[in-house]
A protein has these predicted regions:
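S-adenosyl-L-methionine
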Residues: 1-44, 73-99
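Conserved SAM-binding motif I beta-strand of class I
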Residues: 67-72
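A short SAM/SAH-binding and catalytic strip from SAM-dependent methyltransferases
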Residues: 101-115
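C-terminal substrate-binding/active-site "lid" region of AdoMet-derived donor-dependent transferases
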Residues: 113-162
Length: 162
């Protein structure tokens, strides 16, 4: 995880440009993005990454991969991401991989129905490392798959090790 003056200046431009840009920097958002970066820190051989639920691309900015594709359903977010990264707009279950990325990241598991998630999960290419992230915040109106605990999270996200 590396960023300097140029990146910090760009993030401040994001906050000034978009009314909801500051939300990408809430403490819980930074904590979850930092966790992903720390988990992937020693995967030096990774070069390519697809981020589902890329939002404004802050996680992409924090990762140190030369090839990152940002995926989101909202054009507004992708307009910002497109300044630095290849983008794809649409429902995550409709995404088609052209190549096998080294890592697939889904940070929006709580925002999609089980049907959409299952279809998306089935498409993860064999050999791709994947990171799945969600939360237990049932109060947000868009959280349709928040989880009570890690056991529930593992079960509905196909992370069972049985």
């Amino acid at each position: 995880m590396r960023f300097g003056e140029k990146q910090l200046t760009r993030w401040m431009e994001l906050v000034r440009t978009y009314d909801d840009g500051i939300e990408a920097f809430w403490p819980s958002q930074i904590k979850s993005k930092t966790w992903i970066c720390n988990e992937l820190e020693f995967k030096e051989h990774f070069r390519s990454c697809v981020i589902f639920g890329s939002w404004y691309g802050v996680l992409a900015d924090m990762l140190d991969f030369p090839e990152i594709t940002c995926v989101d359903k909202e054009a507004k977010y992708l307009e910002w991401c497109a300044q630095k990264y290849p983008i794809w707009q649409g429902c995550i279950s409709n995404y088609e991989y052209n190549d096998v990325p080294d890592v697939v990241i889904n940070t929006i598991t709580e925002h999609v129905s089980q049907e959409v998630y299952d279809k998306w999960f089935e498409k993860i290419p064999v050999g791709a490392y994947y990171v799945i992230q969600g939360n237990n915040d049932f109060s947000h109106k868009d959280h349709v798959r928040a989880c009570e605990d890690l056991n529930m999270f593992a079960s509905i996200n196909h992370m069972d090790h049985g």
